[in-house]
Structures are given as C-alpha cells and as structure tokens.
Amino acid sequence: MSAIEKFDRLARGYAAHDYADPARYTARRADVALALGPELAAGSTVLDLACGDANMAEPFLARGLRYRGVDGSAGMIEEARARLGDTVPLQVARMDEYEPPGRVDMTLCLRAFYYPADRGAFLRRVAAYTRVKLVFDFDPRVQDRKQIVCELHENGFGRVELRPFFLPQRAAPPAPIRAALLALEQAGPLARAALHVRGIWFCAARPSVSPART
C-alpha cells in the first residue's frame, strides 16, 4: 500500500483519531512556526504542503493569515473541504511536484519533510516560490540535523534557525506539564540532550535569493 492509499483510508475523522488535543496542538505549532525565523506581516500567505486534512488552516486563519493546503491524498483533501468548505484553496497534488500560482510568504511542511525522494530538487523548488521562510519539523533520532542544515544551504536557503518542540501529539498533558515542556524547549543544552530521547526540531529557513517572480 502506498503512502497516499494509506492516508486515503485514514482520512475520515483523521485529526480526531491522530491527535489527543487537535486544537491545542495545531495552535501551538502555528505559534512556533510564526515565531521562528523572520516575522510574517498580517495577511501573509501560508502554503501548507502535505497538509493532510488541513488541520493547520484554522489557527493560521485565526492569526490573520491566508492559507492554502496541498496534499497528495484526495481523501484528505475531501475531509478538509467537508470541514472548511470554500473558505481556503485546497488542492490534490504531490508536495515535491506542486508549484503555487504565485509566490507565497511561508511554506509549511509538518510531519512530511522526509517524503520527497530528491530533497535537493524539492528544496530548490520551494526556495524559488517562497518569499520569507520555509518552516518544517523533523525527528533528530531519524534525520541528522547537520546534514539537513547543509542541504538547506546547498539548495537555495541562507539563514537557518531551529528550536526544540516537546508538546506530544498523542497525549494531552495537564497545564503544569505543558508549562514544564515549554520551559524545557528553552533550556539550551538540556533541551538538546532531551531530543536524544523525545521531541522534534522545528526549523525555519530563509531563502537566500528572492526571485523576480510575483
């Protein structure tokens, strides 16, 4: 079974069964994506690659941004449209082949950075249509941080910023635990040590060249 077929089968009620607290988790991810790297102005455009059921749409819309979602699974896009209607543009397309109709301010790629078979080509494509920053996450126990930073620099990106993220996806910890996890994210060497066991990196990369395309 291909990844697309898998997500077609999982699409119905995806957020409810894949996240313990979907609203809190997506809101926190949106806040981290916006805080990391260059700031976005109100009304900026966010392109969400491999968006799944577009569960990131609501937090970005609530923060005054424009959202566009793309996913290779027709089932996921159908699930997103059932919830969002025509409020945001949604499209079925492979993330490593898609090109938006115009440049976007932020390209988002969550839980999907490992999908493109040719990551260099993918990064160059994204750098060409992204004005401000690419934001993605990755598991440091699976993907090497230094290698990823090198690939970004070699394929159209300049300044790279990273920060740990420890809020769990499939558990809903009480407020004191959430506060402790947030403090751990800002604990420097201790946070980096914790990433050997749990958590992910969030990364924001600024395109090194701004093409003339509008």
Task: Give, region by region, the residue ranges found by the protein language model.
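Class I SAM-dependent methyltransferase SAM/SAH-binding core
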Residues: 53-97
